[in-house]
A protein has these predicted regions:
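Aromatic (tryptophan-biased) beta-strands that constitute blades/sheets of beta-rich domains
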Residues: 14-27, 57-66, 124-133, 179-254
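Beta-propeller blade signature
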Residues: 2, 7-12, 47-56, 108-123, ...
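Repeat-blade elements of multi-bladed beta-propeller folds
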Residues: 1-5, 28-48, 72-104, 109, ...
């Protein structure tokens, strides 16, 4: 609630006054906390913290701050999942800020638009996998990760699955972060804005088939009335269309 996490006795509905400061600890989170062994796991937008589940004592914090990091956000807000057997927390992260202008945040913007695996025992990030490098399109991963045991040709893979705004279904090995299926890297358009940078390659999945597309064309509204089609074409006559199309001064991108 607000910037506090409370501990409530479910049998009485009252605060556990022995926890933290009279029943609460100061911590802000956008997702529900988890419990692993005797650790309370709280994920804030930019860190993963653990507390003693009995008394609320602070135990550890991992700030998602890579040496390359030169941007705001990349927040954990879409949800987390806990692999109790292996003691790993999986989290999906948001997009870097400023969102549509990347001049002051060159590089891939590590840990943004990514799936992260955090080892609760070693208190280290095991791996990360990025869906969109140097995001300029608000392609944060807005869904929680899903844990699943996937059987392929009589072999079982422990996987984490993330559905992304780009239409990708990322299926990754929980322990290594490696994709279960081959991933293609395709060349993406460069930026026309002076000083801006668009990452030259983005991932493209063939398996599983994308469940939606980010490309848009005139054929996508060809079942409307002639008058409406003409109206839309006029509105979009100066717009740019394409896969990971970049921004241009005074032009819209679709």
């Amino acid at each position: 609630v607000g910037n506090k996490v409370y501990k409530i006795d479910v049998s009485t509905g009252k605060l556990e006054k022995s926890f933290g400061t009279k029943g609460f600890i100061e911590s802000f989170t956008l997702v529900a906390p988890l419990i692993y062994k005797k650790k309370l796991i709280i994920v804030s937008p930019d860190s993963i913290s653990t507390f003693d589940v009995e008394n609320g004592k602070f135990l550890s914090e991992k700030v998602l701050n890579h040496p390359e990091k030169n941007f705001l956000r990349g927040a954990i807000w879409g949800g987390i999942a806990l692999d109790r057997k292996n003691g790993i927390v999986f989290a999906n992260t948001g997009n870097p800020q400023p969102g549509n202008y990347g001049v002051h945040r060159p590089g891939i913007n590590h840990y943004s638009c990514s799936v992260l695996a955090y080892d609760l025992n070693s208190e280290k990030i095991l791996w990360s996998f990025q869906d969109v490098a140097h995001d300029l399109w608000d392609f944060d991963i807005a869904s929680p990760p899903i844990l699943h045991d996937l059987e392929i040709e009589d072999k079982v893979f422990e996987v984490v699955i993330s559905l992304t705004k780009t239409g990708n279904t990322l299926i990754l090995d929980r322990n290594t972060g490696k994709p279960i299926f081959d991933i293609e890297y395709k060349r993406a358009p460069s930026s026309d804005l002076i000083g801006d940078f668009a990452y030259p390659f983005q991932i493209f999945l063939n398996t599983p088939e994308r469940f939606s597309k980010i490309e848009f064309g005139h054929e996508d509204y060809n079942k409307l009335s002639k008058a409406k089609i003409h109206e839309i074409k006029e509105y979009l006559k100066n717009a740019k269309f394409g896969w990971f199309e970049t921004h241009e001064f005074l032009l819209s991108i679709i």
